């Protein structure tokens, strides 16, 4: 009930569209599908959710009862294909920052119900999904972007720290595999 009241209070204080972000791995609390659906129904400016619970059943439950035009987006790159199969409309991505064309292609193939083709790209990126979070977010993606020359440094502000040497080495190895294809 506390989560519902919190978001309802936010929604009532502004006309700005709001996208919920369900990331229990960071917050320690899951926004249950029932709460999401209540907010979607009761608060017209809550327009969607970035669903990063890792729970396909929860996404399915939201998709079955959500009002139109409430948007469901994956917040887990590695589950985007599965979430889109359940009806999610897209993703707010981490890996897409480093491989925008490739990841966009994967998502567009999913949205076109071309899942076999999407699965080929999914398998190509699979090893990197995991490495993005080994040393915590955003250490992995910052290291990958640095290695690709897309940012000038991979330094994070404390208490966050950069990717470890072993993770950096693995990112370089998997990056080489991805980019050779």
Features from the language model and the residues they span:
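Active-site beta->alpha loop and helix N-cap motifs at the rims of alpha/beta catalytic domains
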Residues: 1-28, 38
């Amino acid at each position: 009930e506390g989560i519902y009241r919190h978001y309802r209070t936010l929604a009532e204080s502004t006309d700005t569209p709001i996208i919920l972000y369900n990331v229990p791995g960071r917050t320690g609390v899951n926004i249950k599908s029932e709460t999401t659906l209540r907010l979607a129904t009761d608060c017209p400016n809550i327009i969607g959710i970035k669903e990063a619970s890792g729970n396909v059943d929860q996404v399915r439950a939201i998709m079955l009862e959500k009002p139109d035009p409430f948007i469901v987006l994956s917040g887990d790159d590695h589950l985007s294909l599965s979430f889109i199969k359940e009806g999610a409309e897209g993703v707010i991505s981490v890996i897409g920052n480093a491989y925008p064309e490739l990841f966009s292609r994967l998502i567009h193939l999913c949205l076109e119900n071309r899942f076999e083709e999407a699965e080929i790209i999914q398998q190509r990126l699979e090893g990197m999904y995991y490495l993005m979070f080994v040393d915590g977010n955003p250490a992995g993606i910052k290291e990958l972007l640095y290695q690709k020359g897309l940012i000038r440094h991979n330094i994070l502000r404390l208490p966050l720290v950069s990717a470890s040497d072993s993770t950096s080495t693995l990112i370089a190895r998997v990056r080489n595999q991805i980019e050779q294809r």
